[in-house]
Structures are given as C-alpha cells and as structure tokens.
Amino acid sequence: MDILEAAKKGKAKEIEALLAKGADLEATDREGRTPLMLAAQYGRTATVRLLVDKGAKPDARDTHRWNAFMLALLAPSGGVVHTTHDAVLKLLPQPKRFRLAITASWTPEKALFSSCFMRPEEMTQHMRQIHPDGMVIEALRHFAATSGRDLIAIVSADARGDTEISERPTPKDVDAVLTLQVEPGAACVQQVDRLSMLIQATLNRPEDQTPLLEKSFGAGVKTGMRGQSATNPNQHGPLYETWAKSQAGPLYWAVLTALLLG
C-alpha cells in the first residue's frame, strides 16, 4: 500500500511507517491530489491530523486547483458533508469570509409568458408585485445564514425589478459582485399555467470584466420547477418562491467554489 492509498483509507499507522521509510509527504496521484487532500476528501480525521502535524501543505492545489479544505467541504466522498468531515474541516486553515454584493433583476422568459388566466401585460404587472428577483435574493440570503457555514457575507443586495437602472451604487469594498438575471415564465398547458424560472448567474471581481462564474440554474420548463403547475394566478407567487429556495443551495455552493478557486 502506498502513502496515497493509505491516506484515502485512513491508515494512520501505515502512513507513519511509510514516512519513516522515506515516503514523500507531498506525493500526488494522477489528479495532483496529495495524501492530505485524499484524507480530507474521505473524512479521515486522525490521518489529516497526523499529516498536518508532519508538515503536509494544506494550501497545495490539485490539477483542478482544489485544496484539502475544498475537497472536504465541496466534494466529500459519499456526496454530502458527513460529520467526520466537520472534524476534518476544523483541522485545516479556514478560508477568509468572502464579502459579496448581489444585484438582481428579472425579465420575462422570451418564449414563455402565456398565462391561461392573464394577458401578457397583466402578467407583467402581476410579476412586478411578486418580485421574483427579490425572492431569489431572499432565498440566497437565508441559505447563506442558515446553511452556508459562514463562508460568505452578503453585504449588499439590490433587487432592480424589470429595470436595469438602480439608484444604489454597488459597493467597492467587496470580494465579488453576483449579478442575477431571473427569467420567470408561464405556459398555458391544458388549462393550467406550467411555470418555469431560469436564474442566470454571473460572478465578477470588482473592476474585472472576466467572470469567475457564468452559470444557469433551474433550466427549462420540462426540467425546471419539476413541472410545477398553477390552477389560478394566486398560486404563482408561492410556487416561484418554493422554486427559488430549491435553487439557493446549488447557487451558493457554485459561488463559493468560484471564489475559493479565484
């Protein structure tokens, strides 16, 4: 068993023996992952502690530019953060808390604004009252506060409605600006409104035109909102709100990953 395999399996005693025989503490696999990265990813707390004590570099990056903390948090074995990974995260240097500004606006999804119950201009007015952009901001704020591990502070949020104009300047003392374009849609199918909501997210450093992240969330009517249907206009708001909440987690982790890589 080599040191990489031992780290992955959490075999601390074998690692001690291998290091005594001159094994490389910073050996890497094909993806550039060191023993510390693998032990962190697989939640091997005792092994992580041993490797850190022996001087393993926690800030080393693999070929995808991920480090041990990112692997333990964002790509743990098993697909979700286990309690073992919490113990691992405490042993590794914590990243700085990122300061994020959000600007959001909404626009009707081009092809899909045909409600069974309202004409397009009525639907536009209805959406102005629902505030889909504000819903997405609120869902993201809530997720950051309750499930985001305090790694992102949302220091400013500007919901601009269906205009691009804002009286409020974006603060300069932030790590990044997240721009959200929310595209609510409705299609009349068999006397019910089939709803959709696409969220286009772009993340930029202040004064930098090259995005750290450009990604869509909640795509398509067929996949989007899992075929959520409204039998009257009063159901639009609650259904859009539920959908915004379901996208907050994927959006938050994508933003955090981009910031940690950036």
Language model: regions and residue ranges:
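Short secondary-structure boundary motifs at beta->alpha junctions and helix caps
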Residues: 124-126, 206-261
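Surface-exposed short loop/turn segments
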Residues: 159-214, 222-225
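A structural "domain/chain start" motif
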Residues: 79-82, 87-150, 159, 254-262
